[in-house]
Each structure stands twice: as structure tokens, then as C-alpha cells.
Amino acid sequence: MSLQSLYKSVYHRIVGDLPAYINELRAEIFKNGKTFFLGSLLQRTAKRYPDNVALICVDKKITYKDLYYRALRLSELLIERGIRPHDRVFLFLENSIEFYIGYYGIVQMGAVVVPLNTFLKEVELTHILNDAKPVLIITSADKVEHFRSMPAVVTLPILTEQDMRLDEPIPVQLPDFKVHELDSDELIALLYTSGTTGLPKGVMLSSRNCMTNAFQIVSCMQLHHTERILGVLPLFHSFTQSTCVWAVLFMGCTVVLVPKIERRYILGALQHKPTFFLGIPALFGLICLMKNAPLDSVKYFFSGGDALPDRIRCAFELVYRRKLCNGYGLTEASPVIAVDFEDEAGPTNTIGRPVLGVSCEIRDDHGKVLPQGEIGALWVKGDNVMLGYYNAPEQTAKVIKDGWLDTGDLAYIDAKGKIVITGRLKDLIINKGFNIYPQEIENVLMSHPAVIRAGVVGKAADMEGEVPVAFVQVSKVDPGLEKTLRDLCMQHLAMYKVPREFIITTHELAVTATGKIDKKVLRKQLK
């Protein structure tokens, strides 16, 4: 069977298995060639599930009816302040009910929401300000002074949660508000990437992109209005937006928000008995260390955002006797591309099959589609693929060709039609003409019980091109550990893949805001 035929059979099998309510939802969202407008989503859900609890955050709760009214009042305030459709509005808030009010207050009056990474420094924020040219910033009161100290913000109006009229009583009968609907393919959300390869790039998403991926998640997870989703990851992250800001609203689910990734907040949120737990590998590692976290109510655990180490997967299954579902995506695809739900054993870097409506190809350097089992660049296509990079047509042209997106990841398709990620193309190390995939080395290093984190990067070598160097984080430095790790690599890897240098430290390795090892920083440390 050809790869294309294999995907078609998987696609039709999934569609055929969808419950009736999912197919009804699909008919509602994708009607007459037009996609449901993101800005109308909260209004729709507030009418359909007015009394459902939309959000729980520590000791606060809000229903969909009340959330919609708060967002409606913010939309009116933005219009009063002169904000117009298509204007860019920055949203710089941590996980909170106010984030949702800000998000939907922006999009339902037709403006473009720009959710910002709250960990960004002034240099990165200034770059984004100059690139996106927002007309207004919504942030918390304690961040106003920080923004005002930046030259690029001196004249920009700033709203805080104090301007959201949160003390205003909710009327019994909600007032009418005419959502300013944009075309399905117009820009509605501008998400800046974490900048692991340079300054952040603005990923342009349309309603079609957002609603397509939200529906793909609903159909994949088969959500009902009774579900409770544990929202631990930052809301500025594309995965959290797709799952906890868009998808849940289709069904009127409840999001249990964790304001910060701290033990007390996680344990507090678990008291609300969530049914879905979404996280990154490092978070599940933390849950393993807790040993007795109350997880009985959770039906599915999803790990994404980074490669899932065998050690964390096995530890989680051993401690809690539950399976971690592995997933894969990137902001440029809104972001979810594939999910591995099945219970069968397989390598951790297996990310499953594409979600509904996504096509995948493995290509060589010349664009030729490779047969099953061969490693190449992973390309994806679907209505969830971004419009492009903001103000960067040349960069867009490099990654999108004929509707296909180059993910930048190396992968192959196994015999069951599942995608197996082998590493990042940009992280590829070439030694004497041999390709070395850092993730392969990292997986070996992570199998040692003393290793907490491992990151491998290439170092220039005159006669060899590049050689691998391993950064290893441990809790305690053992004098014989370097030899042990070298022997471990020699046992499992070809000699040219064995790191020439081991940098072992008890200090935390640099990570991005989404928890991935920041290899840009590791390369700088080498220099």
C-alpha cells in the first residue's frame, strides 16, 4: 500500500468512527465553504451552555454566560477607545480568567489578538512591538510600569484588569452585541514563536486555521460538555490556546486553570477532578516526583511540546499505572498535527497518526517523497497550516510550498502508518559526511538514572565538520559519571555519534518558555 493510500484509509476509518454529535459539529463549523468565525465562538457557547462553568482558577469560577458578558463589555470598551477591526492588540497576561476576557473581548470585535509570552525580555518585546505595531496593550496592573519603561510603548494606551469592569453586576438578560465577523481566511490571531532560532517570528492564523485545529482536537479527544480540562501550560502557548481557549468552547467544557506551574497550584487544581490533563514532559516528570498526586478522575494524559523521554514515560506508567499519550505539533500548524492514542508499545518518539484532515509526507533534500521507513523532512498540509509569517514573505516562502508546510523535523513512517520523529533538521550534526541526530544521543543519555536533562549540539571541528557535545544536568556530580555516560553511548551508538565532550553540571540547563532545552543558549556557551 502506498503512503498516500495508507493515510486515506486511516482518515476514512477515523471519520467513520466519529460519534453523531461530532459530525453535527463539523457541519456547523464548516458550512457552505465558510468556517465558523473565532470571534463568534464565545457568544454561541454562552447561548447554548449559559450556566456551564467555563473556568475555575484557584478560588474563582465563572460561567459561560458571565464570561461572555465580561468579554462583551471589554469589546465595547475597545470600540470606545477607537480600536477598529484588523488592529493588533497585545495580550500580556498570565493564566487567569482575565486572559479569556481579554482574548475574546479582542477577537469578537474583529481586532487581531496577539498573546505574548510573559517570560520575554525587553529586547524580544521591543522587536515584537516594532514588528506587530499594536494599537493597545492589555496587561496586569503590576506590568504597566515595566511596559512604560520601554521607549516603544511610551505613547501606546494600556488597559489592565481594573478596566474590565469585573465588579459590574451581570444582567439577567444579556444585551445584544453584533460580532464583527472577518472572512474565514483573514488574520485573527498573531502568535509569536519562542525564538529558538533567532528573534521571534509572528505566525499568522485565520479563523479557518484556529477552528480547523480546534475541531481536530474535539474529534480526536471526543470531548463532551461534561469534560474538565486541566490547563497547566501558559495560555500564550499555541497548544494551550487550541485546546483550552478554542476547542473547549465548542462543547461548553470547563477549564481548570493553574496560574503557575507550582506543586500547590497543581494539587489544588486536581481537587476539581479534571478529566483531561495536558502537559509537557517536564511537567509529567514533576508529577512522577509527587508519587501520589490524585489523578483518578483523569481519563487521558497528553504530553506534547517536546520529545517525551522513555524515562519519564516509564516512570509515569510505573508510579500511576496510566498511559501518557504522545502528541506533536508546531505553532505554524495551529498547532496539533498528530496524536498517538494507542496502548501498544513503541518508541517514545512515535507521535502517532495525523489528526483528521492533515496530510503528511516524508521528503528528501530534493523534495522527492520517500517510501515508508526512510528518514527525511516531514511536510504537512491541511486547513490548520498558517497563513504565513507576519511581515516576512521570504521566510514564509521557505517553509510553505504549494500549501505544504516544512516542519523542520526529521521523521519516518513506520509499518503501522505512524510518524516517528528522529530530530530537528536545524539541529542535524554532520560529521565527516555522516548525519548525527542529537535526539538519538539524548535518548541514550536520558536512559541513565542520574541524568535529569540532556542536550546535544554540534561543535565545529576543522577536520571533521562538526562533533557532538553533550550538556548533561544531574543532581550530583560523580567523578566517574563522564566515563559511565561515554561507555553507555559507545554501547548503544556508532562511534562517530558518541559525544566528544561531556559538560556535566548540577545547574539547570537553559530552557525556552515552553520547557524545551534552548540549544541556541547551549551553542553560545560552547563559544
List each model region and its residues:
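Conserved AMP-binding/adenylate-forming core of the ANL superfamily
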Residues: 30-35, 43, 51-96, 100-104, ...
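Conserved pre-ATP/AMP-binding loop-to-beta segment of ANL
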Residues: 50, 95, 173-192, 199, ...
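Flexible, low-complexity linker/hinge segments
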Residues: 27-36, 164-187
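Structural core segment of the AMP-binding/adenylate-forming
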Residues: 1-9, 14, 43, 80-81, ...
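Conserved AMP-binding/adenylation subdomain of ANL enzymes
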Residues: 211-228, 235-276, 285, 290-291
